[in-house]
């Protein structure tokens, strides 16, 4: 895993190095029930490092919550490795319509749907983020995505609008 430092420089972490960096927040994590959220880029591509980080935490008596903010657009094995240890999955779905999804991301959403179904089957805690993306989907598309998610059993849905910066 890596993180952006306050100086705007990316820093790479080993699982042990990340543990050493965040352990100073242990009291806060225990007081609030908090933990570490992996996001940015696609954290599931670092699933082995996240797994090793979690193991290092447990080996050191730290049962911090692990959250993943993901697109889920990776082969199933990447998510499967973490299913039992992730406390909360935050999934940016873009749109459930395959054509809209591909127009926006350049990829199909088969992995997304398959992985989402796998998480649901494993009773994972999931929040799905469904954005209105100007020039890519409409309010009606967002409603259809939410309806499809409800049919799958998803109840925690974060609907929002992408903000496009103008110069």
How would you name each of these model-derived features?
Residues 19, 23-162:
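Conserved AdoMet/S-adenosylmethionine-binding subsite of the radical SAM
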Residues 1-12:
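Canonical Radical SAM [4Fe-4S] cluster-binding loop centered on the CxxxCxxC motif
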Residues 16:
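Alpha/beta-hydrolase active-site loop
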């Amino acid at each position: 895993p890596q993180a952006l430092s306050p100086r705007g420089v990316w820093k790479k972490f080993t699982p042990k190095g990340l543990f050493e960096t965040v352990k100073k927040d242990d009291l806060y994590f225990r007081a609030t029930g908090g933990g570490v959220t992996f996001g940015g880029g696609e954290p599931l591509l670092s699933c082995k490092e996240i797994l090793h980080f979690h193991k290092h935490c447990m080996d050191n008596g730290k049962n911090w919550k692990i959250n993943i903010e993901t697109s889920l657009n990776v082969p199933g094995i990447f998510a499967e490795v973490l299913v039992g240890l992730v406390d909360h999955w935050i999934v940016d779905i873009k749109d459930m319509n395959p054509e809209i999804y591909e127009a926006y991301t350049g990829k199909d959403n088969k992995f997304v749907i398959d992985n989402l179904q796998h998480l649901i089957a494993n009773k994972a805690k999931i929040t799905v983020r469904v954005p209105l993306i100007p020039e890519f989907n409409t309010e009606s598309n967002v409603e259809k995505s939410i309806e499809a998610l409800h049919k799958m059993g998803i109840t925690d849905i974060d609907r929002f609008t992408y903000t496009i910066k103008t110069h």
